[in-house]
Amino acid sequence: DDKYTNVGSLKETDFEAVESLNPDLIIIGGRQAEDIDSFKEIAPTVNLAVDGQDYMNSFKTVVTDLGKLFDKEDEAKKAIDEIEAKIEKVNKTVKEKGLTASVVMANEGNISAFSAKSRYGLIYNGLGFAEVDKNIDDSTHGQQVSFEYFLENKSDYVFVVDRGAVTGKGEAASKLFDNEVMNKTEVAKNGNIVYLNSVIWYTMTGGIESTNQMIDEIADAVK
């Protein structure tokens, strides 16, 4: 769209393009955090990335700050209240059913598992799923696992983020998971492998609309 200026990609910012816009304020997310000093040379800069390990508290802080910044405090509070109500409803359903989950990312044929202390902590800490594996390495990129992992760690749900759907690389996660080993698992037999909207879960977490969609996806899965 011609009305928007291209200022780079998710990983590489075109600082000359940013400077040409002569901004009064620059708001960045987690992917640009390491370049914050370069942004500050252009204009005052704030990092409003949401912390996945403490998603809701971080989300509320960010939305509240944005409400103050743009004189939309009432709208910000309303959005937070509505999302908290939705989370409480899903959390209640999940807890009543005693559901467990594994959260994984498919990336060019590899599978990585993520814990409650990871970027996908909302599923555990907010929406109430119990971790089936409490010994996952909490690195940024998760812990690489094989499909046999799901035979040993039997969760009620497996939530899959397909990085390849965002980057355009690798086989689709749904095809990757359709294999002899995975098809032996109860989670596959029960139809509880859930392929999440990867654009949102991988690149757009933290927004009001994206958070609503994230919660709705999980709510639909556990109806």
Where on the chain are the PLM-derived regions?
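Solvent-exposed loop/turn segments at secondary-structure junctions
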Residues: 12, 25, 32-34, 51-54, ...
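Short, solvent-exposed loop/beta-turn-alpha elements that line the ligand-binding surface or hinge
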Residues: 1-10, 133-141, 186, 203-204
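Proline-aspartate-enriched helix->loop->beta-strand connector
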Residues: 22-28, 44, 150, 154-158
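Ligand-binding pocket segment of bilobal, Venus flytrap-like solute-binding proteins
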Residues: 140-165
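A short, structured surface patch at a secondary-structure boundary
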Residues: 1-20, 31
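Extracytoplasmic substrate-binding proteins
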Residues: 35, 42-108, 192, 201-223
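Structured C-terminal subdomain patch of bacterial secreted/periplasmic proteins
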Residues: 156-223
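Alpha-helical, coiled-coil/dimerization segments enriched in small aliphatic residues
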Residues: 113-143
